């Protein structure tokens, strides 16, 4: 039944994704973070106090998320096993973001093909932290491909990884870790102190999933009739060409599979950041690379699900 719940949740995400106006745990987690952050900022003046308060905030948000998820699931199972199973499917479904990521990326294909830079820049500003006001089509394509490649890890592979380790409650706790990083894990002045622990713990949580993504995306490249060997080679060579210890693993693998170059300099919050290049520019990046990256994401996602199901069955057999 547990494996069936995983499969149904994955299929639901593949087919419908997150309906825009449905209640979603990540929104509730976001409200909790905002509430706790307000308290921390009120009672923790100074950088040192904010770093400690940010650590307490991380423990509270992740702990509450895991505890509530575990409690709701336990209560639902006591009401009726089938009701508990349905709640488990729903919880797992909400931790996956493949369809939402694919939809967000596909939103750029039409305006880019029509050379509507104004619409493309506005839409890109909704999903990335860099300055998009002066970006050209190739830079927008690059940003979208990078977003899909990076979020293949924290939107699909990592939730499945923590689902395998600790069930739906641990997968929900991972979403809290990831949401904390998304909201406060920045290096600029406002969040540097309070978000330090959140940023570091997100790096820890994604350490193994990011490295697993290198292998899965490399295999996916071969299945998508792209260069699997080049994906794995470039993915390994450029795995540390990023300020994050995790992001370049998936981005470099995708860059290698497609034969394009990612990364490079960008403007963030008014400051130019010179990032190293990822991959080799064997050709110019194009709008078609967005759909190719989405395809890689889905194949890698399927491989991840199959891997964790096989591991679960193997462990059950040993037990």
From Swiss-Prot:
Pathway: Cofactor biosynthesis; adenosylcobalamin biosynthesis. One of its GO terms (molecular function) is ABC-type vitamin B12 transporter activity. The keyword Transmembrane applies. One of its GO terms (biological process) is cobalamin biosynthetic process. It comes from Salmonella paratyphi A (strain ATCC 9150 / SARB42). Converts cobyric acid to cobinamide by the addition of aminopropanol on the F carboxylic group. However, the true cosubstrate could be (R)-1-amino-2-propanol O-2-phosphate, leading to cobinamide phosphate. The keyword Lipoprotein does not apply. It is a multi-pass membrane protein. Keywords: Cell membrane, Cobalamin biosynthesis, Membrane, Transmembrane, Transmembrane helix. Pfam families: CobD_Cbib. GO terms for cellular component: plasma membrane. This is Cobalamin biosynthesis protein CbiB.
């Amino acid at each position: 039944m547990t494996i069936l719940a995983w499969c149904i949740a994955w299929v639901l995400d593949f087919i419908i994704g997150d309906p825009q106006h449905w209640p979603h745990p990540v929104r509730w987690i976001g409200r909790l973070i905002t509430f706790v952050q307000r308290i921390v900022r009120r009672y923790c003046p100074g950088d040192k106090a904010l770093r400690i308060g940010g650590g307490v905030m991380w423990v509270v948000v992740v702990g509450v998320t895991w505890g509530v998820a575990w409690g709701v699931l336990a209560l639902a199972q006591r009401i009726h096993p089938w009701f508990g199973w349905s709640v488990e499917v729903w919880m797992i479904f909400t931790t996956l973001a493949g369809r939402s990521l694919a939809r967000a990326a596909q939103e750029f294909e039409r305006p880019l093909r029509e050379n509507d830079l104004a619409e493309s820049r506005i839409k890109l500003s909704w999903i990335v932290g860099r300055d998009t006001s002066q970006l050209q089509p190739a830079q927008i394509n690059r940003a979208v491909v990078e977003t899909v490649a990076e979020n293949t890890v924290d939107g699909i592979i990592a939730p499945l990884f923590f689902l395998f380790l600790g069930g739906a409650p641990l997968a929900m706790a991972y979403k809290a870790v990831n949401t904390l990083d998304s909201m406060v894990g920045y290096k600029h002045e406002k969040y540097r102190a309070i978000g330090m622990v959140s940023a570091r713990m997100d790096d820890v949580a994604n350490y193994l999933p990011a490295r697993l993504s290198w292998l899965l995306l490399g295999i996916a490249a071969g299945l998508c009739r792209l260069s699997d060997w080049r994906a794995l080679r470039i993915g390994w060579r450029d795995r540390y060409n990023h300020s994050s210890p995790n992001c370049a693993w998936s981005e470099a693998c995708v860059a290698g599979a497609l034969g394009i170059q990612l990364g490079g300099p960008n403007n963030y919050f008014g400051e130019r950041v010179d990032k190293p290049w990822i991959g080799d520019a064997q050709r110019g990046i194009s709008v078609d690379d967005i759909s190719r990256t989405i395809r890689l994401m889905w194949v890698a996602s399927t491989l991840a699900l199959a891997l964790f199901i096989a591991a679960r069955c193997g462990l059950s057999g040993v037990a």
